[in-house]
């Protein structure tokens, strides 16, 4: 009964321990899956044809495919996509997603072959995941700038005297200022004006207009950018008075400066180009010196571009760009038949000041990205952890069951009834009553007899457990006469009387058993502990004189 109860208890304990182990394993798997998926964000469901045309390559086709397994196969990729439940695609750019149309998630309803609780695309659609830790190492933006164009619109006034025509030389200076910034697209028109003048004075006014807009944006998944735009307009007028005689001038001016902006990490590099325009004029032999004008403009405009991340981590770049533009106009006029040349030189220099905060943020993001990449676990590592936990739990359960069984076995009480031979005067020995008297009544070990003593080793003088002290020898009836038989019976009676003074022979065993649980036969111990010898209570032949004399003698 106790063993049946113990078996039931063991089965119940095994079921409870197995249930707890299953819960722990489930929690461990969920935490590991969450750790692996922490670096990727779900972007949406897109058409498989569009994703494949964007350059994503097939990484593997796995019968036990899952979202985490696909992401572990492409740890350094910017985007991963799952198709038809078992195919995994990887890509290194996310810019193509802005030009694609997102589909509904119902089109990506195919379950993953290795983990049916997640969706892995559809028959013609893909689930797309974007790596949130991907650092946008370079932002390419093209910016072009066309220089200011000057339109000369001369107007003439004929109100001069002959004295002024003879020889008059005047010099004027024109100051021209232009403001320019980094621009994505700036369109400028160049206007050419030509006039023929036969007067002694001319007034020239020039207007320079420059409109720039600055837009800087950096896009990652779920990122909003703020755009800073500025417009600068500058108008400069100049007046030139000169005394000429029959002068024909033709002016063509076009200056273009192109800037290319490339942003890599937190540094911006601008390249500038310098163009020179030559303005040729033809004058008559009586031409005089034309004034020389020069102008310069300096612009210092800080531009701040900030990005506010919503769900993913981006690196804000704060950069101050100082653009300095210098326009120098030189006019050289010679006499006689030589040509007049006007040279416009535009020089632009850029001074960059990058914020240290941007550099520190970029370095911190790079370190975090590297540490996160090192902390990723591969699919084999996850499988090994799960298998190790399962076998560890099973091993612990087996050890507990073995200890419980051993403890129960050690506490089981030994039943002496099962070890007995059910023989009278016996504690389980094969020889219930070995014949052999103690060596002497004075020794202390008279109860410790050797159980190897048998009747064959006892001589005629030590028969029936006692010695013939009277010197009578027992012999077989065939070799004795009637007188010798009577003598032997008399000696036997004397030996019986002497035996009454001897202690009873009790064959004890070592105290190796629990004395409280010992059980003995009902007929063994009481009879053996009596001081007198055994007697015949109901003799078969009460008329036998020998037995009657023996009984009466013992009673006396």
UniProtKB/Swiss-Prot annotation:
The chain crosses the membrane at residues 385-405. Residues 39-132 form the WSC domain. Glycans are attached at residues 84, 367, 370. Residues 39-384 are extracellular. Pfam families: WSC. The gene is WSC3. GO terms for cellular component: fungal-type vacuole; mating projection tip; plasma membrane. Residues 406-556 are cytoplasmic. This is Cell wall integrity and stress response component 3. It comes from Saccharomyces cerevisiae (strain ATCC 204508 / S288c) (Baker's yeast). Residues 142-169, 184-257 have a biased composition (Low complexity). InterPro entries: Immunoregulatory_rcpt-like, WSC_carb-bd. It is a single-pass type I membrane protein. Keywords: Cell wall biogenesis/degradation, Glycoprotein, Membrane, Signal, Transmembrane, Transmembrane helix. Its main location: membrane. One of its GO terms (biological process) is Rho protein signal transduction. Residues 1-38 form the signal peptide. It comes from the Eukaryota. Residues 546-556 have a biased composition (Polar residues). One of its GO terms (molecular function) is transmembrane signaling receptor activity. It is found in: Membrane.
